[in-house]
């Protein structure tokens, strides 16, 4: 009788051990696992979803003559103001605008009904700190 009770317990333990050994192989999104921020994987989609409507390829819709869909536009220096400054989030106007509490400066503007999540803001900050490599 003891043997019958221990068999299910041993099987349960074996299954639990097997499942526990598989946990590290579960694919967690690269955004949280990879300390290196990849522009195409982590940044481009956020810019496309939240910024390109007003700062993208459509010249008729573009605001402030700013393009964030091209490397040239994203790093241009317009009167000492640059959207992204590699290695320097505090000098990056785009980062300042997405993190400000001032509704007059906030991007995307509140009336657009778009906003960046804290995770998206953090990824952009880390990307800038890591050199803002454009791909």
Describe these PLM feature segments.
Residues 2, 26-135:
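Aromatic- and Gly/Pro-enriched helix-to-coil junctions and flexible linker segments
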Residues 14-24:
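Bacterial N-terminal signal peptides
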Residues 2-15:
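Bacterial N-terminal signal peptides that target proteins for export
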